[in-house]
UniProtKB/Swiss-Prot annotation:
Keywords: Cell cycle, Cell division, Cyclin, Cytoplasm, Mitosis, Nucleus
Start-end of Acidic residues biased regions: 302-313
Function: May play a role in growth regulation and in negative regulation of cell cycle progression.
Gene name per UniProt: Ccng2
Family in the record: Belongs to the cyclin family. Cyclin G subfamily.
Transferase keyword on record: no
GO CC terms, sorted: cytosol; nucleus
Factors inducing expression: Activated in B-cells by agents causing growth inhibition or growth arrest.
Tissue specificity statement from the Swiss-Prot or TrEMBL entry: Highest levels in intestine. Intermediate levels in spleen, brain and kidney. Low levels in testis, stomach, pancreas, liver, salivary gland and muscle. According to PubMed:9139721 also abundant in thymus.
Keyword Transmembrane: no
Locations listed in the record: Cytoplasm; Nucleus
Organism phylogeny: Eukaryota, Metazoa, Chordata, Craniata, Vertebrata
Stated name of the protein: Cyclin-G2
InterPro entries: Cyclin, Cyclin-like_dom, Cyclin-like_sf, Cyclin_N
Amino acid sequence: MKDLGAKHLAGGEGVQLFGLLNFYLEQEQRYQPREKGLILMEATPENDNTLCSRLRNAKVEDLRSLTNFFGSGTETFVLAVNILDRFLALMKVKPKHLSCIGVCCFLLAARLAEEEGDVPPTHDVIRISQCKCTASDIKRMEKIISEKLHYELEATTALNFLHLYHAIVFCHTSERKEILSLDKLEAQLKACNCRVVFSKARPSVLALCLLNLEIETIKSVELLEILLLVKKHLKLSDTEFFYWRELVSKCLAEYSSPRCCKPDLKKLVWIVSRRTAQNLHSSYYSVPELPTIPEGGCFDGSESEDSGEDMSCGEESLSSSPPSDQECTFFFDFQVAQTLCFPP
């Protein structure tokens, strides 16, 4: 704290923020995935019957799709990734069990980060994720994950540091908060979370790199000076800082590329049987025959009610043409998926 100087710690709010920063710094190593396990995962060949980094990254993108679908917050996603990585780095997991583990990590994180009424039911998550396991399987796997992580699931993550750095920076400047979008920073953090290499970075360093790159983009000298003082407070070496900043910069450059499949835009994919596909074709894409609506005429009560019901059923179908009957892989956006899976 002394390194920052009295000028930058003026006021009680600044002291409280740096006190919280010190607490986070003490906690972060405790919730860091085992580096040896992460390195082993990266070195595993893709054709082997063991978990590799590509499968892990794909599962994290699935977690992002689930958080989008159920309207969960960034905290749920980041916490689910932390639980997943800590478990995978600790245990020898077969690829066939990864779907069940991913669902469990999402549910465990949602119960910690979301309001009680916003936590999706287990059966709904199973149905949407198509993980091919039962509610009993999920319950057993949740118990295994919790026990292996010693029930320490509420981790200090890079998102905690990102929010805290953002608050510290604007506590000591007259700049408007709008110039440094927290939503944009969170989206960039999600992109980094989709790559296993960033699970080896300390959360405090990853968050600092993201904020540093964004401040350099908006070219604010004042904000950059404050952030460098925060870096000094962390006792972070230039070697470590510039190493991770370069990796983050490359990741964000690729993430901004039109060829990149961004997790925010990734659609849920359902593989269904041919019979189910035919039922979906006929039920969702069919255009019902609607009765003619007379101009200026009068309806009796029953006719009016029936007509209104028919129109609501066919309203969304009019602009869509049915795909080929041979196709059994469906790409739904979240609104359509909710209509099919959770009918009113």
